């Protein structure tokens, strides 16, 4: 169908749609949002709704699908979750009063980064991120429209951008410059981001601080412009832009946070089994979000950490007061998101009631905090604004039984507005008057069944059956005739009805106006409400950390400037919690000033990785202000943590385990300082044995000689333990085992010195390999050990060879090649070999045959 043949309504649809080609256009028509053409076809498939057509008898019917306006949000949520944009076109005038086609406009574009309303409420932040560049560095800005938070920073390069974008759990990225092919590939394909583009800077002097760097202001200004383009309104809840520096927090790449299960369990993708899960005893949505932020960005300032610790200690010292505080916080709703709903003009009476209930709890919370009588809480108490005038307004204005909608009436409390009360009196008395008229006319007419009914079409009427029509008085006038009865009116009834309908209409209009005025008054308090939310969130997180510390017998860590680590009987806090009643075996970790590297050897499944993660989690917990899982802990303040734990292939970008290992190792040794913590687990296992060993040794030497960072390096290359003879800051430790009657028990305890065996066959036994296979492996191992020759590669790459033999012997003869073959076989860690490593090993062995 050509545009010339379209109806005015469809022409209007196409005119609007051309401005939003990348979004589903929900076009309001009466009680439905309609979709047309390709939008309808795609939406019908995705949303599982009926696909029909407009102008069905035409040569080219227009595909059409629709959803009811009152339940549209659930369908919008589905589209947004799948990464689509949705444009909402509303009717801007009453269709009954419209001349020609009803005026329609897009009032909002909802995108994955701009979700505010949702049928699936989630306490987590939803950050919309923008990126700009001046060619030498990147400006990154982000905001959460549901809370009003607004931040900006400068990043040196694309890897730093990638890490920060991942850390922010970004779904939508606003780009302010022309992307290169590599950048486009990174963001679209590898990171699976929805990209939106904005070249215009929105200059808002109230939100943007001109003291910030130009590149940050550019990113923030373009983000603001994009938000104004999509939301189509001024947003009073957006907070002033806050500059932050990555270096002001404990730096951790996204891969590090993932490998340590900080915010979610890397294997399940769920909260359970993460540090966040362990520490979350918060009672409010704001507290939950702030706890995630603290875990994501631990501090590097000992004074700020100490302030948090002091408050936690205060809470621990006052159990009953803390319990009262916890109970009071349960009555606090999500102030930040309630404020944003007010700003968006979407707050309903229930929202205001929740806000009022929250404000009624604030004085109680403040009084409880004052009862602790602690100087550590003074600053926090002073920041808590009780807003008594706002609480009084909501309490006096909003009816406690108010509905969710703002058009049904029943929102405003009796006694708040004199005129509204008069209208309500008329409606109540009108009902009584009608009852009196019914009784009077029944008696006068002698019609015993006479009654007054009401419907929208006929209004109020007397219902008279056919058998009583002869008794109808002359002053009754007919309103409707039915098969078995007729409906009548009277002048008196019509007068009362008119007064009641007028009162009802005026009451509804006035009540709506009053509610809008109240909501506007609430909007003027948004900044104070947001500040209150921050204070209550801080209280909530600190009480949560106190509860966790008490329940799990954690201790307050201390900090030193000597770069010494002393953790007495430390535990992996999350593993301990998951184990529940099982006994957790603690480990002591010590690094003096002279020690920078612990080289850890021991069998698989013995606890090397847990020991490494234990240290990292202890550091993170300590630096976010939490108490820690140990008998005692004295730590330096670390500036960064670098990890390579586990074989996390980067399958999206097609990079192998070994490539990822080398990239992460490269990043660590280049970015680490003497104040950093490095955790490398089995580095080098992704390539051939000697390649891996050589690289592992070279990396250890580089860290020792040039970086100086505190390092835990777990390895299955037992030859590396000899490094302690010439690297003065390296010490060997191992996971202890107990051998008895041919059985091996892993003690999960770290002991000094190197491990003497790998216990690979024992691990295979635990894994359930057949008994005859294991027995055969034992015999082969004994034979191989007996025939092993004295070929050794020392740490200076000097090789000692046995005396040459004149001719090639059989496989079981002891010649140079066989000795080398035996040595390589013994070095193979079969339980850890990947398919690629196995192929490399076979090629190496084949060369010796």
Curated annotation (Swiss-Prot):
Pfam families, A to Z: MutS_I, MutS_II, MutS_III, MutS_IV, MutS_V
Keyword Lipid biosynthesis (UniProt): no
GO terms of biological process kind: mismatch repair
InterPro entries per the UniProt record, alphabetical: DNA_mismatch_repair_MutS, DNA_mismatch_repair_MutS-lik_N, DNA_mismatch_repair_MutS/MSH, DNA_mismatch_repair_MutS_C, DNA_mismatch_repair_MutS_clamp, DNA_mismatch_repair_MutS_core, DNA_mismatch_repair_MutS_N, DNA_mismatch_repair_MutS_sf
UniProt binding sites for ATP: 602-609
GO (cellular component) term, any one: cytosol
Annotated SMART domains: MUTSac, MUTSd
Keyword line: ATP-binding, DNA damage, DNA repair, DNA-binding, Nucleotide-binding
A single MF term (Gene Ontology): mismatched DNA binding
PROSITE patterns in UniProt: DNA_MISMATCH_REPAIR_2
Family the UniProt entry places it in: Belongs to the DNA mismatch repair MutS family.
Function per UniProt: This protein is involved in the repair of mismatches in DNA. It is possible that it carries out the mismatch recognition step. This protein has a weak ATPase activity.
NCBIfam families cross-referenced by the UniProt entry: mutS1, PRK05399.1
Protein name listed in UniProt: DNA mismatch repair protein MutS
Gene designation: mutS
């Amino acid at each position: 169908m050509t545009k010339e043949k379209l109806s005015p309504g469809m022409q209007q649809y196409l005119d609007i749609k051309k401005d939003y080609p990348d979004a589903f256009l929900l076009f309001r028509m009466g009680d439905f949002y309609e979709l047309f053409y390709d939008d309808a076809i795609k939406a019908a498939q995705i949303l599982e709704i009926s696909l029909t057509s407009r102008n069905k008898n035409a040569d080219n019917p227009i595909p059409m699908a629709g959803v009811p306006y009152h339940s549209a949000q659930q369908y919008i949520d589905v589209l947004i979750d799948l990464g689509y944009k949705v444009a909402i076109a509303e009717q801007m005038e009453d269709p009954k009063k419209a001349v020609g086609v009803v005026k329609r406009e897009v009032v909002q574009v909802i995108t994955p980064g701009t979700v505010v309303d949702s049928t699936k409420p989630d306490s987590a932040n939803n950050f919309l991120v923008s990126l700009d560049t001046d060619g030498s560095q990147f400006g990154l800005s982000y905001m959460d429209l549901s809370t009003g938070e607004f931040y900006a920073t400068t990043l040196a390069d694309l890897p730093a951008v990638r890490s920060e974008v991942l850390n922010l759990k970004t779904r939508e990225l606003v780009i302010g410059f022309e992307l290169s092919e590599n950048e486009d590939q990174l963001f679209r394909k590898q990171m699976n981001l929805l990209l939106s583009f904005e070249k215009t800077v929105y200059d808002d002097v109230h939100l943007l601080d001109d003291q910030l760097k130009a590149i940050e202001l550019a990113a923030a200004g373009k983000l603001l412009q994009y938000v104004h383009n999509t939301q189509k309104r001024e947003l009073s809840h957006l907070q002033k832009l806050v500059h932050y520096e990555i270096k002001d927090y404990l730096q951790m790449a996204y891969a590090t946070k993932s490998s340590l299960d900080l915010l979610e369990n890397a294997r399940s993708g769920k909260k359970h089994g993460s540090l966040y899960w362990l520490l979350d005893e918060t009672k409010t949505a704001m507290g939950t979000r702030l706890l995630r932020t603290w875990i994501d960005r631990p501090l590097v300032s000992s004074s700020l950490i100490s302030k948090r610790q002091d408050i936690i200690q205060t809470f621990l010292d006052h159990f009953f007061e803390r319990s009262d505080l916890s109970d009071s916080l349960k009555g606090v709703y999500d102030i930040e998101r309630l404020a944003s709903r007010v700003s968006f003009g979407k707050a309903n009476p229930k929202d205001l009631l929740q806000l009022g209930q929250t404000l009624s709890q604030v004085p109680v919370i403040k009084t409880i905090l004052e009862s602790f009588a602690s100087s550590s809480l003074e600053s926090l108490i002073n920041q808590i604004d009780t807003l008594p005038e706002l609480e009084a307004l909501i309490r006096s204005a909003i009816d406690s039984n108010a509905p969710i909608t703002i058009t049904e009436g029943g929102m405003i409390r009796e006694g708040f507005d004199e005129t509204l009360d008069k209208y309500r009196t008329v409606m109540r008395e009108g009902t009584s008057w009608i009852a009196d008229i019914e009784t009077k006319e029944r008696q006068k007419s002698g019609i015993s069944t006479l009654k007054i009914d009401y419907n929208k079409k006929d209004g109020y009427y007397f219902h008279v059956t056919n058998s009583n029509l002869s008794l109808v008085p002359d002053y009754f006038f007919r309103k409707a005739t039915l098969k078995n009865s007729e409906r009548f009116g009277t002048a008196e009834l019509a007068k009362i009805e008119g007064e009641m309908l007028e009162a009802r209409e005026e009451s509804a209009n006035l009540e709506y106006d009053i509610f809008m005025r109240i909501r506007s008054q609430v909007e003027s308090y948004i900044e104070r409400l947001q500040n209150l939310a921050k204070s209550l969130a801080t209280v909530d997180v600190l009480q949560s950390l106190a509860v966790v510390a008490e329940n799990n017998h954690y201790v307050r860590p201390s900090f030193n400037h000597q770069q010494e680590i002393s953790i007495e009987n430390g535990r992996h806090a999350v593993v301990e919690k998951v184990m529940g009643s099982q006994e957790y075996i603690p480990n002591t970790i010590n690094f003096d000033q002279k020690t920078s590297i612990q080289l850890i050897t021991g069998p698989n499944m013995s606890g090397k990785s847990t020991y490494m993660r234990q240290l990292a989690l202890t550091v993170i917990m300590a630096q976010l202000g939490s108490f820690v899982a140990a008998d005692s802990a004295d730590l330096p303040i670390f500036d960064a943590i670098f990890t390579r734990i586990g074989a996390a292939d980067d399958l999206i970008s097609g990079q192998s385990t070994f490539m990822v290992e080398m990239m992460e190792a490269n990043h660590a040794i280049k970015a680490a300082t003497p104040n950093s913590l490095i955790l490398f687990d089995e580095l080098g296992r992704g390539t051939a044995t000697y390649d891996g060993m050589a690289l592992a040794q070279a990396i250890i030497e580089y860290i020792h000689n040039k970086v100086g960072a505190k390092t835990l390096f777990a390895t299955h290359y037992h030859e590396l333990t000899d490094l302690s003879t010439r690297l003065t800051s390296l010490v060997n430790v191992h996971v202890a085992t107990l051998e008895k009657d041919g059985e091996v028990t892993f003690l999960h305890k770290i002991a000094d010195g190197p491990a003497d065996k790998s216990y690979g066959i024992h691990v295979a036994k635990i894994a359930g390999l057949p008994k005859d296979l294991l027995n055969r492996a034992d015999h082969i191992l004994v034979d191989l050990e007996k025939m092993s020759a004295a070929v050794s590669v020392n740490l200076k790459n000097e090789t000692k060879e046995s005396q040459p033999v004149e001719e090639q012997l059989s496989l079981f003869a002891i010649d140079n090649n066989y000795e080398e073959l035996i040595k390589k076989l013994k070095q193979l860690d079969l339980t850890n070999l990947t398919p690629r490593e196995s192929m490399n090993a076979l090629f190496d062995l084949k060369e010796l045959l």
